[in-house]
């Protein structure tokens, strides 16, 4: 086994209620689809993986989409390093909310741009689509971000969405001249840990869940 430094990436999944944020996260972490909708308050998950031959520890915060929890948004927006902006392609309202999330993130970060990916979820329901792929791409171009369509049910592009966000954070690190940094949602004691990582460990994932009441 060789010692390697493992970078932790603080990813935040945001979007309106019922768009499939939790389903995307659970599909990535545990490899199964949630059949029943149970509104999330705030859940945190961790997964170790390899992206472009580099080991990464994903620290993923799955957030509440319901309006009654909107007061919590600025707290996680301050600490996130990258954001998945999720809407459902069969919901025009959820698509229109993406701009609100993007503007709030930039305001909290006091930045003109920040690592984000726009995600059009529920691709398996594309027969009920009310938001075209072209509209999603146009909004992403306006924001200077990528657009990807996913299905938590069929696993379509689920890994790609999260992994592309990590790639965007790496680009930001390089642009800012940062080698490593950040903290963890799970323990807040530092983002970079020296770990013994072997070939058999690289694909292993771990999950820790906590609900903030």
UniProtKB/Swiss-Prot annotation:
GO CC terms? plasma membrane
Keyword terms of this UniProt record: Cell membrane, GTP-binding, Hydrolase, Lipoprotein, Membrane, Methylation, Nucleotide-binding, Prenylation
Per the record, membrane topology reads: Lipid-anchor
Q: Which residues bind GTP?
A: 15-22, 62-66, 121-124
Q: Name the enzyme group at the top EC level.
A: hydrolase
The source's domain of life comes to: Eukaryota
Subcellular localization, as worded in the UniProt entry: Cell membrane
Q: Which residues form the propeptide?
A: 211-213
Catalytic activity of the protein? GTP + H2O = GDP + phosphate + H(+)
Which residues get modified to Cysteine methyl ester? 210
Q: Which GO terms describe its molecular function?
A: G protein activity; GDP binding; GTP binding; GTPase activity
Protein function: Ras proteins bind GDP/GTP and possess intrinsic GTPase activity.
Concerning its family, UniProt says: Belongs to the small GTPase superfamily. Ras family.
Quote the protein name from its UniProt record.
Answer: Protein ras-1
Organism from which the protein derives: Neurospora crassa (strain ATCC 24698 / 74-OR23-1A / CBS 708.71 / DSM 1257 / FGSC 987)
Q: Which gene encodes it?
A: ras-1
């Amino acid at each position: 086994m060789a010692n390697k430094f493992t970078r932790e990436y603080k990813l935040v999944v945001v979007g309106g209620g019922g768009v499939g944020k939790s389903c995307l996260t659970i599909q990535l972490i545990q490899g199964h689809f949630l059949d029943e909708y149970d509104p999330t308050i705030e859940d945190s998950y961790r997964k170790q993986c390899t992206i472009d031959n580099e080991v990464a520890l994903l620290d993923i915060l799955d957030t509440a989409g319901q309006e009654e929890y909107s007061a919590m948004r600025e707290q996680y927006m301050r600490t996130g390093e990258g954001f998945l902006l999720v809407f459902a392609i069969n919901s025009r309202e959820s698509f229109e909310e993406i701009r609100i999330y993007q503007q709030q993130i930039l305001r909290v970060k006091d930045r003109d741009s920040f690592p984000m990916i726009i995600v059009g979820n529920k691709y398996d329901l594309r027969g009920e689509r009310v938001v075209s792929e072209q509209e999603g791409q146009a909004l992403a171009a306006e924001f200077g971000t990528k657009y990807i369509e996913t299905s938590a049910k069929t696993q379509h592009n689920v890994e790609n969405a999260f992994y592309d966000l990590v790639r965007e954070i790496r680009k930001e690190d390089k642009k800012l001249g940062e080698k490593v940094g950040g903290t963890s949602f799970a323990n807040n004691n530092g983002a970079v840990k020296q770990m013994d990582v072997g070939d058999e460990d690289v694909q292993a994932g771990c999950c820790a869940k906590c609900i903030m009441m």
